[in-house]
Amino acid sequence: MAKPNIKVLALDLDGTLTNDDKQITPRTRAALDQALAKGVMVVLASGRPTEGVTPVARDLALGQNGRAGAILSYNGGAIVDCGPGARILWQQVLPAPMVPALCSFAAQQNVAIVTYSPEGIVTERPQDPWAMREGFTNKLPMVGVPDLPTYVNYPVNKMLITLDPIRLRPVLQAGLDRFAGQIDLYPSSPFFIEAVPLGVAKDRSLAALLDRMGLTRDNLMACGDGMNDRSMIHYAGVGVAMANAEGPVKAQADYITAADNNHDGVAEAIERFIL
């Protein structure tokens, strides 16, 4: 049977591309090298900020020597080309009035809120232990500012409320009540609440990228393991769920790898459908 004509490979990072030690295994790296040599664009698709994904893109030499690559960050809030100039290929940003409104809400709830800049994780509470987890996860420094709404004079793809897990449900419900129909709010961990533009998702941004390239979903393979990967796995011509994926994610997949993220599941998918 002929292999699908895959031109774009979208890969979630944690639990998919990387193993539990946050490393890309040699077999997976070799499979990616072969796919890139065939002209396939590799899109690193993550909920992390762009700066938090950039080290992985550099490690894979995406955007160098004809190795086509892009970073899909903020769960689809932006797609940035890995080539010179880091062109923004697609983005959705929070309405400007939402920045002070969200900061005011966080202050009323006595919880930290952060956003992102090229310098790192920006917040009025750089010593907050829950906010510091976002810096640790992304290997980015905490940048303390006296007044976040004043500091943020640039487009914002995402803000993140960080808090003790005990407070998650009541704060989330209060936020949903206050911002209904204006932005999307959802928990991404027991201590994080994402605040993003309405409708942000990995499938929507990938559709925009494919349209820009003159391609269709039939030219896309997407691999993931988490709930935020469901949309792109369902949308892709070849949707791949890792063996370690959650049940609802596997339900959206065309193919479930026999191997998990610790045993070259991504390499298995690349070898089966691309090489």
Residue ranges and their predicted role:
Residues 28, 53-57, 171, 175, ...:
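Hydrophobic packing residues within well-ordered alpha-helices of enzyme cores
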Residues 3-8, 25, 194-275:
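Mg2+-dependent phosphoryl-transfer enzymes with acidic/Ser/Thr/Gly-rich catalytic loops
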Residues 5-21:
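Asp-based phosphoryl-transfer active-site loop
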Residues 60, 67, 75, 179-181, ...:
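Short, structured coil segments at secondary-structure junctions
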Residues 26-130:
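Active-site phosphate-binding/coordination module
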Residues 105, 109-223, 227:
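Conserved acidic, metal-coordinating active-site core of Asp-based
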Residues 59-63, 88, 130-134, 202-203, ...:
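Short, hinge-like loop/turn segments at secondary-structure boundaries
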Residues 39-43, 68-69, 158, 218-219, ...:
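Short active-site oxyanion
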